[in-house]
């Protein structure tokens, strides 16, 4: 799951520098859907 988040977030961080936005989003969403929101294609 961590690898999925890295593949999804890191490229976006380099483009948008959205760390302040994504970091709290990850911490709040992680216990809810366990990464289903971040990498639905990989989860299937």
Curated annotation (Swiss-Prot):
Top-level lineage group: Bacteria
Keyword Membrane among record annotations: no
Pfam family, one: PyrBI_leader
Keywords, ordered alphabetically: Leader peptide, Pyrimidine biosynthesis
Gene Ontology annotations of biological process type: pyrimidine nucleobase biosynthetic process; pyrimidine nucleotide biosynthetic process; transcriptional attenuation
NCBIfam families: PRK10224.1
UniProt protein name: pyr operon leader peptide
Taxonomic source organism: Escherichia coli (strain K12)
Gene that this sequence comes from: pyrL
């Amino acid at each position: 799951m961590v690898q999925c988040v890295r593949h999804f977030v890191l490229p976006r961080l380099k483009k948008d520098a959205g760390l302040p936005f994504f970091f709290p989003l990850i911490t709040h969403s992680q216990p809810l859907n366990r990464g289903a929101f971040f990498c639905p294609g990989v989860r299937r």
